[in-house]
């Protein structure tokens, strides 16, 4: 059928590119969306962060006879006024809006009347079918005819009245049927209206075609054979009606195609446009008027030929969800489909592949897929031309269901120069126009009052739209600004993926055509980035290659490069955020190792990887946008190295230079090597059938590790916790070790039977009580608790040491020192536990001492040698330590000073009972509250107070003489004690910074028995402000005890006073000294003075703060510093290692931090580390976060139905409840089907059901158990499939 040709309107329209200066972009993401009332004046709005709304239904490509008309050059003042009122909230004036009208009723669908002279559009809605006429000279749009509400007089003469349902689609006919309008809706019929018969008595209704059994979704007229009408319904049937035949009058379709139970969402005839000057356009197929396409709820795209309707011409799984709309290309053999999965896919329906030249100038964004020519969808091979239909030529990911999309009606020789208009379900009110040559940025965005219900192209420059607020708008695209015009020309931002540098955009903005004047030229696009340093990720973005992008974590490790090209493509549906639209050309999925970070101002971040066909044919011509990045850490390090010559000459560790310059590689290296959880190597439950020999074999490695730590850190083998570690698996050896950790009962009996001890009866009763089982059980529980705590601290120490070595390997000294500080603080904490066992430890390790801890004072015990061990033997640090410092045998640690000293004199156990009574009386003088609590008479209280006030210290010489006597007494006592047990002083021990902190208030000279001078004592007493604070009670007590035992005639009482805050302590101490001096008893005086001072400090210890090297305090401070500085790895390490021990922060912070860290690991493709982190997480609720995030549906291989097996599940559950045997549930599973009572695929080797993990041979698809395949392929070294087919192991 011949058609007249009309010139294009390109020359008649003038393009306005004027812009108003504004600091805001039209597409600002921070602008609110104002709801506008429906009136004649229309104000546009800017797009929001949410994406456009979409509705179901399709539309036929408009008829192009309207191109015959010329656009009038004149316009009225009213239209100019209306255009002038259109102002975006971004303050950029738009001149594209030409028509606007508020419709009187609800609107749902729109189409054009294909009569050039009418200049009308038809709009349908609920109880509304109106004909709207627009006038270009006045810019006016008005309702001229409502086919449902015509002359009432004529309507009263009708014999019948037809009721219409909610209209879902409306279409207008062509040529001889150009006055026909077809509507369909929720009813089962298609109604045909003749607009030329509106004023007749019979009315405009011409016929009703009601052969469908369910609601009809789409109708369409054939452009060539204009009498043919096609309809698609929810009943899964496609019906073709010939309006000329008598079948339509009989309510019968001429052709019915049943697609099964799959509902038809949209159906379209292939268009047959006749464009002017169409000689250069590739001629379409000869059967264009016979072809039509349909898209279904299953996502299936079908094409048919009327001459062979019994079989589909093409079958394409276009979408993973329901397909909602489709549109044929005006001239080429392509179809664009949209679905609920948010994808807009371009499919080549021809019989030959694309021309390679068509890919040469495609504007390509590879910020999503870093290897621009490496994306192949599953099942597609570029080597086989016949399989190219399995992959879409282009994919626009909108993240919202697409319900309306239409090609721009124009003669385009290149498919990627085509423009498509689309709208989607959602709250965003706009119609987006994309050019496939630059689909990551929309060409135009037509903002409306509310979400769009439908649109139609009048010609290539005029588009009409209807929205939910019943507003009809018309847009002149020649005068509408493009998105590129409103985007900022200069942009700088931090790199999202690495966060270590800046990103600049090239100033050449490009255009929307592949070969236009604004398009990028391949010959001139030479990229030289030698002036700026680019990371491996940026280089792979800028220079696409045929090889798949290597995982960035592998690039720095040559040993892993052999696996870099073996990655497979990811799944079909990448997770997309709600506010991001991504575009991928020629790739249905993202490439392995790619990432999504790009975001445009229109929220349509476009990603594109090269077409799968272009990969083989012309990928070297595919270009990506230029992105220049600066690696700031590298630049700063270079500047620093230039200024510090020695730093540049510093030798680096072998292997660290390969990745230490890349922050991303350093992060990945640390994430792999650092230890985050002490539960990683633990076994949750020991098998019941594990024998003692197996247990012994399993514990060998642990014992060796702990023994290695004991040797490495210089721990004494006489400590209690080392005995716990070296506990043997033999019952005899265990008994021996336990006996060694308890106080020797023989020594207790010896003390008990001493003739000089007046309290022998009391100790005898204690010895009897120690045999009671109740006390023995309590001691065992205490020992077990201490053993577990010691073991836990050893694990933490080893992990801190490991993490410190990792940071030292990459020359990160700051973090290395931090981990060493935490390690040494844990060693100090470990020493406190051992000291408590050695001093107060008798009460934990001996049943007798559980009753009376003071018995320690009267016994030498079997642990005297370990009590004499020095602090440096516990916490020697290899880094930052000093040499040449000897250990102090008499030093017992801070906690030991809070209890009465033990075994310091040879006559400590021979203390007369009278002295004990007087000692208890002096104790009552410490606190009036304590005195009253003990119930002493007030007269005794008064006498004691008088004695204390009467004998105040008034002369320093008296104290010097007193201390000389004390030194003589102690020296004699030390001589007697040395005859019994001579401590061995370790030589050349190293001490850590914790030793230096604790021992800073005593001179190293005392380690060799030298005497201090007055000046040295004064310097030590006032060395630091921290050393003078009462919070360090243990160190203060240690200094007081040591000085009281020193042989120094020059010691003054003011040495005991450290600050004003501790004046009361010193005063009480001096009172005690003077009272004992008056009594004149020198022998017990030394012990009594030391005891009272220790008791005084012990009472104040609860209200004092911990020392700065306390593990809990130090780790919390480091955690706060790491959070403030943004040290992610250190923060997460502290949380996972120390949260359960020291309660570093709140549980909410822990959960949020771990969630964000897991997201970061996923972003850097460290999935295995993230899985291990969840697996060994000590919190169950966080562990559950990695489960239940996906649902796998399994279908029966026989009946093709979903495997639910509810009946068998109920059956086995009832049997379990009835019998109480839980193993009954093992018979339940999804390896069989309740519907057909058949089993699924059996193992190809053992022919047993596949109940759990299953392996599959990719070549042939045969499945089997992992054990069977391992035995077949690995043990027996077979390469063929066990079934004997042609499959083989790659």
From Swiss-Prot:
Its main location: other. A zinc finger (RING-type) spans 1243-1285. Residues 1-13, 36-48, 750-770, 858-885, 896-907, 972-981, 1018-1034 have a biased composition (Polar residues). One of its GO terms (molecular function) is zinc ion binding. GO terms for cellular component: cytosol; GATOR2 complex; vacuolar membrane. Residues 1-87, 732-774, 856-924, 960-984, 1004-1034 are annotated as: Disordered. The keyword Amino-acid biosynthesis does not apply. One of its GO terms (biological process) is positive regulation of macroautophagy. WD repeats lie at residues 162-203, 211-251, 259-314, 318-357, 397-444, 447-485, 778-819, 821-842, 1079-1119, 1166-1205. The keyword Nucleotidyltransferase does not apply. It is found in: Vacuole. PROSITE patterns: WD_REPEATS_1, WD_REPEATS_2, WD_REPEATS_REGION, ZF_RING_2. Keywords: Metal-binding, Repeat, Vacuole, WD repeat, Zinc, Zinc-finger. InterPro entries: WD40/YVTN_repeat-like_dom_sf, WD40_repeat_CS, WD40_repeat_dom_sf, WD40_rpt, WDR24, WDR59_RTC1-like_RING_Znf, Znf_RING. Pfam families: WD40, zf-RING_16. May be involved in a process influencing telomere capping. Belongs to the WD repeat RTC1 family. This is Restriction of telomere capping protein 1. The lineage of its organism: Eukaryota, Fungi, Dikarya, Ascomycota, Saccharomycotina. The gene is RTC1.
């Amino acid at each position: 059928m011949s058609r007249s040709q009309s010139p294009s309107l390109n020359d008649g329209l003038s393009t306005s590119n004027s812009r108003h200066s504004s600091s805001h972009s039209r597409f600002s993401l921070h602008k609110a969306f104002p709801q506008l009332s429906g009136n004649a004046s229309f104000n546009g709005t800017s797009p929001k962060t949410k994406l456009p709304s979409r509705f179901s239904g399709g539309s036929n490509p408009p008829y192009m006879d309207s191109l015959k008309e010329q656009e009038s050059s004149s316009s009225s003042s009213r239209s100019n006024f209306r255009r002038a009122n259109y102002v975006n909230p971004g303050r950029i004036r738009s001149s594209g809006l030409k028509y606007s009208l508020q419709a009187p009723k609800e609107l749902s669908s729109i189409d054009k009347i294909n009569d050039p002279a009418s200049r009308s559009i038809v709009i349908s809605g609920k109880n509304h079918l109106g004909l709207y006429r627009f006038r270009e000279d006045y810019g006016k749009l008005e309702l001229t005819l409502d086919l449902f509400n015509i002359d009432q007089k004529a309507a009263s003469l009708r014999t019948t009245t037809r009721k219409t349902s909610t209209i879902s689609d409306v279409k207008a006919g062509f040529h001889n049927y150009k006055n026909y309008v077809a509507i369909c809706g929720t009813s089962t019929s298609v109604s045909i209206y003749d607009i030329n018969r509106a004023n007749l008595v019979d009315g405009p209704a011409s016929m009703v075609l009601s052969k469908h059994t369910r609601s009809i979704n789409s109708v369409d007229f054939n452009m060539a054979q204009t009498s043919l009408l096609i309809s698609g319904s929810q009943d899964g049937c496609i019906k073709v009606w010939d309006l000329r035949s008598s079948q339509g009058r009989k309510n019968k379709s001429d052709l019915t195609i049943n697609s099964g139970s799959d509902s038809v969402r949209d159906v379209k005839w292939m268009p047959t446009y006749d464009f002017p000057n169409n000689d250069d356009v590739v001629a379409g197929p000869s059967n264009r008027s016979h072809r039509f396409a349909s898209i279904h709820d299953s996502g299936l795209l079908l094409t048919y030929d009327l001459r062979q309707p019994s079989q589909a011409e093409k079958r394409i799984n276009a979408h993973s969800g329901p397909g909602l709309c489709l549109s044929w290309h005006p001239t080429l053999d392509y179809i664009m489909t949209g679905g609920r999965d948010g994808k807009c896919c371009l499919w080549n329906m021809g019989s030959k592949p694309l021309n390679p030249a068509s890919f040469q100038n495609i504007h390509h964004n590879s910020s999503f897929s870093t290897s621009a020519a490496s994306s192949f969808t599953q099942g597609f091979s570029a080597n086989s031309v016949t399989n190219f239909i399995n992959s879409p030529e282009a994919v626009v990911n909108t993240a919202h269901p697409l319900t309306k999309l239409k090609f721009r009606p124009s003669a385009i020789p290149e498919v990627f120069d085509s423009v498509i208009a689309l709208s989607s379900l959602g709250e965003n009110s706009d119609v987006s126009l994309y050019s496939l040559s630059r689909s990551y940025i929309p060409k135009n965005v037509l903002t409306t009052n509310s979400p769009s219900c439908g649109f139609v192209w009048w010609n290539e420059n005029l588009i009409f739209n209807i929205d939910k607020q019943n507003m009809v708008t018309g847009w002149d695209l020649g005068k509408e600004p493009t998105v590129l015009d409103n985007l900022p020309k200069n942009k700088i931002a931090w790199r999202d993926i690495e966060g270590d540098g800046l990103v600049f955009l090239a100033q050449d903005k490009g255009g929307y055509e592949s070969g236009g004047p604004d398009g990028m030229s391949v010959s001139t696009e030479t990229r030289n980035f030698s002036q700026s340093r680019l990371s491996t990720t940026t280089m792979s973005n800028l220079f696409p290659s045929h090889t798949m992008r290597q995982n960035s974590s592998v690039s720095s490790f040559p040993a892993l490069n052999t696996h870099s090209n073996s990655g497979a493509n990811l799944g079909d549906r990448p997770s997309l955020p709600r506010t991001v639209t991504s575009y991928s050309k020629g790739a249905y999925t993202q490439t392995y190792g790619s990432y999504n970070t790009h975001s445009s101002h229109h929220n349509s971040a476009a990603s594109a990887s090269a077409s799968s066909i272009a990969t083989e044919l012309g990928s070297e011509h595919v270009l990506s946008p230029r992105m220049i990045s600066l690696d700031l850490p590298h630049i700063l390090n270079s500047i620093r190295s230039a200024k510090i010559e020695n730093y540049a000459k510093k030798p680096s560790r072998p292997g660290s230079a390969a990745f230490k310059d890349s922050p991303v590689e350093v992060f990945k290296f640390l994430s792999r090597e650092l230890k985050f959880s002490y539960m990683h190597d633990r076994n949750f439950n020991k098998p019941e059938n594990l024998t003692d020999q197996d247990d012994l074999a399993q514990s060998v490695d642990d014992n060796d590790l702990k023994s290695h730590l004991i040797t490495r850190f210089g721990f004494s083998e006489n400590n209690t916790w080392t005995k716990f570690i070296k506990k043997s698996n033999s019952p005899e050896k265990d008994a021996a070790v336990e006996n060694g950790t308890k106080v020797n009962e023989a020594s207790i009996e010896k003390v008990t039977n001493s003739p000089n001890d007046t309290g022998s009866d009391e100790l005898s009763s204690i010895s009897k009580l120690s045999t009671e089982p109740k006390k023995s059980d309590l001691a065992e529980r205490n020992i077990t608790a201490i053993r577990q705590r010691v073991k836990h601290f050893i694990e933490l120490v080893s992990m801190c040491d490991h993490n410190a070595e990792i940071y030292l390997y990459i020359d990160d000294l700051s973090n290395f020192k931090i981990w060493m500080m935490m390690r040494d603080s844990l060693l100090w904490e470990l020493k406190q536990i051992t000291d408590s066992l050695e001093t107060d430890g008798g009460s934990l390790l001996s049943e007798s001492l559980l009753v009376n801890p003071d018995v320690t004072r009267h016994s030498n015990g079997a642990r005297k040698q370990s009590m004499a061990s020095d602090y440096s033997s516990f916490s020697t640090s290899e880094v930052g330590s000093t040499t040449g410092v000897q250990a102090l045998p008499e030093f017992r640690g801070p906690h030991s000073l809070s209890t009465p000293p033990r075994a310091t004199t040879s006559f400590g156990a021979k203390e007369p009972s009278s002295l004990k009574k007087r000692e208890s009386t002096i104790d009552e003088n410490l606190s009036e509250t304590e005195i009253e609590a003990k119930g002493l008479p007030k007269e005794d209280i008064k006498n004691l107070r008088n004695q204390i006030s009467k004998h105040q210290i008034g002369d320093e010489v008296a104290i010097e003489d007193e201390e000389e006597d004390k030194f003589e007494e102690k020296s004699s006592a030390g001589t007697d004690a040395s005859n019994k047990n001579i401590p061995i002083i370790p030589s050349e021990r190293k001490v850590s910074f914790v030793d230096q902190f604790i021992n800073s208030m005593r001179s190293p000279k005392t380690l060799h028995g030298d005497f201090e001078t007055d000046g040295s004592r004064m310097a030590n007493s006032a060395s630091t402000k921290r050393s003078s604070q009462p919070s360090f009670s243990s160190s203060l007590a240690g200094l007081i005890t040591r000085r009281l035992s020193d042989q120094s005639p020059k010691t003054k009482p003011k040495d005991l006073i450290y600050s004003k805050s501790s004046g009361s302590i010193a005063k009480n101490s001096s009172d005690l000294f003077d009272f004992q001096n008056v009594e004149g008893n020198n022998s017990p005086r030394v012990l009594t003075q030391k005891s009272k001072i220790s008791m005084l400090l012990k009472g104040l210890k609860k209200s004092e703060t911990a020392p700065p090297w306390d593990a809990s305090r130090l780790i919390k401070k480091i955690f706060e510093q790491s959070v403030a500085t943004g040290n992610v790895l250190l923060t997460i390490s502290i949380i996972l290692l120390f949260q359960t021990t020291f309660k570093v922060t709140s549980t909410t912070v822990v959960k949020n931090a771990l969630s964000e860290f897991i997201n970061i690991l996923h972003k850097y493709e460290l999935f295995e580390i993230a899985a291990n982190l969840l697996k060994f997480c000590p919190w169950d609720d966080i562990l559950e976060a990695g489960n239940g995030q996906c649902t796998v549906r399994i279908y029966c291989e026989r009946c093709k139905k979903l495997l639910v097996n509810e009946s068998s599940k109920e059956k086995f559950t009832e049997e379990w409840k009835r019998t109480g045997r839980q193993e009954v549930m093992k018979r339940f599973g999804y390896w069989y089907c309740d519907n057909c009572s058949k089993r699924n695929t059996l193992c190809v080797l053992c022919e047993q059901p596949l109940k759990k993990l299953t392996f599959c041979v990719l070549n042939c698809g045969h499945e089997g158990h992992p054990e069977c395949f391992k035995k077949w392929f690995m043990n027996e070294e077979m390469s063929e499939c066990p079934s004997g087919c042609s499959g083989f192991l790659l």
